[in-house]
């Protein structure tokens, strides 16, 4: 207990360590190497990081392995302070305690000091991603200064970064940040929409660890048996996908609910299905190149794989995970951005669906009295004006087709609608537009005796009403 209290006092005494060395740490950019045009921290490599996390979990029997693989604390801080230049596969590991503990043990080894192993069992509880000071007590401010001098010698031997290239990269990043959230990336959209500015600019996830987790599939984590259950669950994108799926459905529901106040529940469900189907979400995912960033332990391009046979659902999943990542990153500020972004993506899908799908057609301009009007103009008993259902709606084709006919089989008008009632009304409306036909049958009705022209309107089966010849 006394050791722990002393440790906390030591930490308080070293609170100024980061402030005093902040400028020096920011100068550590010269320890990076220029790899394929991108700046990357050279002290950590992905495979070694995986081994390091395992070694820390099994520290007692793996201490020697940690000393062999781990960079020291200065190198670790360089990676933490420059996460935007760290390979994305490594970012989740920087949010866990194991790498920092390994770096501190390596620091003690470099400084020829004995490790305080009694502190190791409590290390995970003390670990905080926001805390930059060493947790192990034996690493003092003087030790860090000495280590800085050793690192300076190493830095002088490394290849220096082309300053002009680095500045150009910074300028490019600044230009991108200056673009407003309403701006667009003028990339091609394929068959989704033909527009000059498409797709809408992607809202950015600021937290690099969350952004990296969006593109990590569960298959890359399942063999990491050294991770605890909680660490494993939070190392891949399934939880983010779960959150993003709910957000996507809710936002799309609100968009169409407010946009179409006259739509029935069935119509709203049909339209929402167009917006949140795996096929549509997959198209959006590919449009933003999410499929190229997805990390799995199987070949996504294998044409015979179960993945391909599953219609590329993983691509839709990563899009939902990105939405979830935005919410986890900054729910208060990002939710309005998500709504605005999804509204832009939804617009061409909604326009196409409402234009081409009969089930989504509006009926506010439908003349509900069209059948009565048609009978009043040309109807009489022997004409036998009636409506025949030519096609009923099915799951494959929701269209209904109804024909307005007379007794001899002549078709006066044809109507199409999402149900038989609407299709019948449209058939009557179609017949009413044919003025030549109406004139022909009106003259026929006028030529017959009045007693034969009295008829019962078949469309009013429950009403005892007669239409007399008024011509």
From Swiss-Prot:
Gene3D superfamilies: 3.30.160.20, Ribonuclease III domain (1.10.1520.10). GO terms for biological process: box C/D sno(s)RNA processing; box H/ACA sno(s)RNA processing; chromatin organization; regulation of fungal-type cell wall organization; rRNA processing; rRNA transcription; termination of RNA polymerase II transcription; termination of RNA polymerase II transcription, exosome-dependent. Residues 227-331 form the RNase III domain. The keyword Manganese does not apply. Signal peptide: none annotated. Pfam families: dsrm (PF00035), Ribonuclease_3 (PF00636), RNase_3_N (PF18497). GO terms for molecular function: double-stranded RNA binding; ribonuclease III activity. Its EC number is 3.1.26.3. Keywords: Endonuclease, Hydrolase, Nuclease, RNA-binding. It catalyses: Endonucleolytic cleavage to 5'-phosphomonoester. GO terms for cellular component: nucleolus; nucleoplasm; nucleus. It is an enzyme of class 3 (hydrolase). Residues 1-10, 461-471 have a biased composition (Basic residues). Residues 172-184 have a biased composition (Acidic residues). Present with 4970 molecules/cell in log phase SD medium. DsRNA-specific nuclease that cleaves eukaryotic pre-ribosomal RNA at the U3 snoRNP-dependent A0 site in the 5'-external transcribed spacer (ETS) and in the 3'-ETS. In vitro, cleaves synthetic 5'-ETS RNA A0 site in the absence of snoRNA or other factors. Has an essential growth function in addition to pre-rRNA processing. This is Ribonuclease 3. It comes from Saccharomyces cerevisiae (strain ATCC 204508 / S288c). The lineage of its organism: Eukaryota, Fungi, Dikarya, Ascomycota, Saccharomycotina. The gene is RNT1.
